[in-house]
């Protein structure tokens, strides 16, 4: 408070017997001396004595201390803010080489696994071909399908094994898309950016998990997590089953077509179908290839129902939080009845009658043989899958029946989205250029030959690698001359090609995959389509709260190891319910492709070729400057 060597600060009379002198002392003390006494008496007082300090001095002292405390707090706050930034930078410096090392190790392990087999497989194939074994040739042709060889980090990786290839095909494609971009950036549309923004806003600490950079580009971890969640949307998490819902759906469609054909033959008095009908399937894979024909027959009967068509179940009779009934395998009576697919299957005998619906006494007069209780799906499952040795009894497993109906409805939506699609448009209009990501033949389907109504001889045109939207020169010349105008009407040809060249190989490699596992983009369309009215691109991400919750759970799976089964089921089954809601609404729309066009653009879909790739892959990467 006082400097060294300052003059006295105050003189005052003390009790009339002398003057006191206030001197400055280096020790910040006040020395008060009596000047009239021969031997001055010194009294030392500290500065904080109230009787020596005025009110102003105390206030000034407290203000100085307050300012000093504020300065110390500001310095501490600055250090506290800087510490997480420095720690995050250090963590990123540590995580980047670790992630690169993990990806490298996974790639090396995958290569080692694949390179161990090709020589043996190739020798076996050559032996079969030399012996004239047609099955070996067919196996080779299947391995050359478009989904077998992909380009990853500049190297060709043959996907030989089921459990290492097709099961992770979609996730590996995302990794490959980011790797193929090099130093550039890839964008996936505003829909993925909206999902990332919502996830960052609703979940603390997600920036570190996703590794989001300051430029706001879409995280590869987010895209992979979204693809995993979309693929699981139609899966049943409760119970163990020998058959998937996709397999049950294909068998139901097969039986429905067989029953309809039998009824038509009985009415016409013919012993065989017309020449335009395809040959009946003798194996399950042949039945998969004929699904577009089965769907066409089903759609004809749906149109005959006029206004009494509903693609929704009775939610009042279904569990509110879970897909499967608690401690049971059956719903309340009549829960599935409003759905048009259920009603048609029931009318054709695809779903057998049960004791809850009718008794033997009630149908004895009209059906003395009780044929209504016959279960054709159980017999068909044993015929298609004799090695499983257990029949598929849908009437005893209503959650699987519900999932099978959902699978049929998803196929119907897929057919409507792809109907009359034109993959021969100008390839420069495509947002997704497949040639940048796939190696080998990247070709679209061609028009069926004369007499090949159901695409038995559909194949690639044999041109070198190119984007699938490129039109073959011969077809382009025919169109310009006017002779090929009918080729523009593709009908279901692209769907036939997709089931033959994409879905069959994928099912062969993993026969437990559901419809959303084959077409994750179809699940995304259903989730966005659950909003009433025409969805807008700005609100495309707002209606996916269930998707956000499951993505958050997937990304935090290492932190949520203690989460109960009820929590996982609730979060997962919420997205299944939203998918069912969107599916029922989209199937009720007259022109679903036009209805969803604004949202599809938010998903990077501009052309029919983009739409087909998005339905199969779940995302469409394209090169951008700012992701």
From Swiss-Prot:
<keyword id="KW-1188">Viral release from host cell</keyword>
<feature type="region of interest" description="Interaction with major capsid protein/MCP">
    <location>
        <begin position="1"/>
        <end position="56"/>
    </location>
</feature>
<protein>
    <recommendedName>
        <fullName>Capsid vertex component 2</fullName>
    </recommendedName>
</protein>
<keyword id="KW-1048">Host nucleus</keyword>
<keyword id="KW-1160">Virus entry into host cell</keyword>
<comment type="subunit">
    <text>Heterodimerizes with CVC1. Interacts with major capsid protein/MCP and triplex capsid protein 1/TRX1 at the pentamer vertices. Interacts with the large tegument protein/LTP.</text>
</comment>
<dbReference type="Pfam" id="PF01499">
    <property type="entry name" value="Herpes_UL25"/>
</dbReference>
<keyword id="KW-0167">Capsid protein</keyword>
<dbReference type="GO" id="GO:0042025">
    <property type="term" value="C:host cell nucleus"/>
</dbReference>
<dbReference type="GO" id="GO:0019028">
    <property type="term" value="C:viral capsid"/>
</dbReference>
<comment type="function">
    <text>Capsid vertex-specific component that plays a role during viral DNA encapsidation, assuring correct genome cleavage and presumably stabilizing capsids that contain full-length viral genomes. Participates in the interaction between the capsid and the tegument through interaction with the large tegument protein/LTP.</text>
</comment>
<feature type="region of interest" description="Disordered">
    <location>
        <begin position="458"/>
        <end position="480"/>
    </location>
</feature>
<dbReference type="GO" id="GO:0043657">
    <property type="term" value="C:host cell"/>
</dbReference>
<dbReference type="GO" id="GO:0019072">
    <property type="term" value="P:viral genome packaging"/>
</dbReference>
<keyword id="KW-0231">Viral genome packaging</keyword>
<dbReference type="GO" id="GO:0046718">
    <property type="term" value="P:symbiont entry into host cell"/>
</dbReference>
<comment type="similarity">
    <text>Belongs to the herpesviridae CVC2 protein family.</text>
</comment>
<keyword id="KW-0945">Host-virus interaction</keyword>
<dbReference type="GO" id="GO:0075732">
    <property type="term" value="P:viral penetration into host nucleus"/>
</dbReference>
<dbReference type="InterPro" id="IPR002493">
    <property type="entry name" value="Herpes_UL25"/>
</dbReference>
<keyword id="KW-1163">Viral penetration into host nucleus</keyword>
<keyword id="KW-0946">Virion</keyword>
């Amino acid at each position: 408070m006082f400097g060294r060597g300052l003059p006295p600060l105050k003189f005052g009379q003390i009790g009339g017997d002398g003057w006191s002198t206030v001197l400055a002392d280096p020790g910040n003390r006040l020395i008060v001396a009596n000047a009239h006494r021969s031997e001055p008496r010194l009294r030392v007082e500290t500065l904080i004595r109230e009787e020596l300090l005025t009110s102003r001095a105390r206030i000034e002292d407290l203000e100085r201390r307050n300012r000093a405390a504020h300065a110390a707090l500001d310095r501490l706050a600055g250090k506290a803010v800087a510490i997480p930034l420095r720690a995050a930078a250090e963590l990123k410096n540590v995580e980047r080489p670790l992630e690169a090392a993990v990806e490298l190790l996974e790639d090396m392990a995958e290569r080692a696994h694949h390179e161990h087999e090709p020589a043996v497989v190739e020798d076996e194939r050559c032996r079969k071909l030399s012996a004239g074994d047609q099955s070996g040739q067919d196996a080779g042709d299947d391995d050359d399908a478009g989904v077998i060889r992909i380009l990853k980090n500049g190297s060709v990786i043959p996907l030989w094994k089921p459990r290492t290839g097709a099961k992770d095909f979609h996730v590996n494609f995302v990794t490959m898309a980011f790797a193929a971009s090099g130093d550039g950036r890839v964008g996936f549309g505003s829909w993925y950016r909206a999902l990332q923004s919502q996830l960052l806003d609703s979940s603390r600490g997600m920036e570190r998990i996703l590794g989001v950079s300051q430029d706001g580009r879409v995280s590869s971890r987010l895209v992979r997590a979204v693809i995993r969640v979309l693929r699981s949307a139609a899966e049943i998490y409760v119970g163990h089953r020998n058959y998937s819902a996709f397999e049950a759906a294909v068998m139901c469609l097969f039986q429905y077509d067989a029953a309809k054909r039998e009824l038509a033959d009985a009415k016409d008095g013919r012993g065989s179908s017309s020449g335009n009908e395809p040959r009946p399937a003798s194996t399950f894979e042949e039945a998969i290839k004929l699904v577009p024909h089965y769907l066409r027959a089903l759609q004809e009967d749906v149109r005959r129902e006029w206004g009494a068509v509903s693609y929704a179940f009775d939610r009042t009779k279904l569990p509110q939080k879970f897909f499967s009934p608690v401690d049971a395998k059956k719903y309340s009576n009549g829960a599935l009845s409003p759905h048009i697919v259920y009603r048609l299957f029931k009318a054709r005998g695809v779903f057998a009658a049960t004791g809850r619906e009718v008794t033997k006494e009630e149908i004895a007069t009209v059906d003395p043989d009780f044929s209504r209780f016959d279960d054709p799906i159980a017999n068909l499952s044993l015929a298609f899958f004799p090695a499983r040795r257990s029949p598929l009894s849908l009437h005893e497993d209503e959650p699987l029946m519900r999932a099978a109906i959902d699978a049929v409805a998803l196929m119907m939506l897929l057919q409507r989205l792809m109907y009359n699609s034109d993959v021969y448009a100008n390839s420069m209009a495509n947002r997704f250029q497949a040639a940048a990501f796939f190696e080998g033949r990247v070709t679209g389907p061609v028009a069926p030959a004369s007499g090949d109504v159901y695409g038995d001889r559909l194949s690639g045109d044999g041109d070198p690698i190119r984007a699938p939207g490129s039109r073959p020169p011969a077809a382009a010349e025919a169109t310009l001359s006017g002779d090929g105008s009918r080729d523009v009407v593709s009908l279901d040809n692209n769907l036939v090609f997709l089931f033959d060249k994409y879905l069959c190989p994928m099912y062969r490699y993993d026969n437990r995959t559901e419809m959303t596992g084959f077409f994750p983009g179809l699940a995304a369309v259903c989730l966005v389509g659950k909003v009433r009215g025409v969805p807008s691109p700005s609100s495309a991400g707002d209606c996916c709260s269930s998707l956000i919750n499951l993505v958050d759970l997937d990304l935090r799976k290492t932190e949520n190891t203690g989460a109960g089964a009820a929590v996982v089921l609730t979060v997962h089954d919420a997205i299944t319910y939203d998918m069912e809601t969107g599916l029922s609404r989209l199937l009720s729309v007259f022109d679903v492709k036009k209805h969803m066009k604004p949202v599809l653009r938010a998903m990077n879909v501009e052309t029919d070729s983009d739409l087909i790739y998005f339905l199969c892959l779940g995302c469409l990467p394209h090169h951008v400057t700012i992701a």
